[in-house]
């Protein structure tokens, strides 16, 4: 059986950029390179879908999920905060069956894999661009995040026992 992860919507849920020590920080930056700490968190929630909400016709049955990719970046120069950037970027996804009987028969683990690995991989390029634009617009060099391997991040969290609770569809990497 084949399944498809379909993007229904994507949006900024929360975006914050703080530049608390300007303009002095720009003088400090000319003399020292900032230390940047980045954390990435992925979470998902199931969205209720009523039978009436399903389109009539031949569309396969689907489940809707909101996946949140949260990235926090903090830059410091000599223990002075240069900037703090926090973003929660979300996508609404459906999981559809490509079969004629429209039946979704995925294990809980397979659904988590789609939501916590495949979905954030789709969202990440948009988050990366938004952070680069925000830092650049604030007078700093654009912060270009390294590509995140969500598969490895998820597998490492499983090995550590994080996110094992059935109600906890999250992966956190600090």
Swiss-Prot record:
InterPro entries with a match to the protein in the record: SecB, SecB-like_sf
Keyword field: Chaperone, Cytoplasm, Protein transport, Translocation, Transport
Any one GO molecular-function label of the UniProt entry: unfolded protein binding
Pfam families per record: SecB
Protein localization: Cytoplasm
Any GO CC annotation of this UniProt entry: cytoplasm
Biological process annotations from GO: protein folding; protein tetramerization; protein transport
Keyword Chaperone applies: yes
Role noted for this protein: One of the proteins required for the normal export of preproteins out of the cell cytoplasm. It is a molecular chaperone that binds to a subset of precursor proteins, maintaining them in a translocation-competent state. It also specifically binds to its receptor SecA.
Family: Belongs to the SecB family.
Subunit structure: Homotetramer, a dimer of dimers. One homotetramer interacts with 1 SecA dimer.
Name the UniProt record assigns to this protein: Protein-export protein SecB
Source organism of the structure: Ehrlichia ruminantium (strain Gardel)
Organism lineage string: Bacteria, Pseudomonadati, Pseudomonadota, Alphaproteobacteria, Rickettsiales
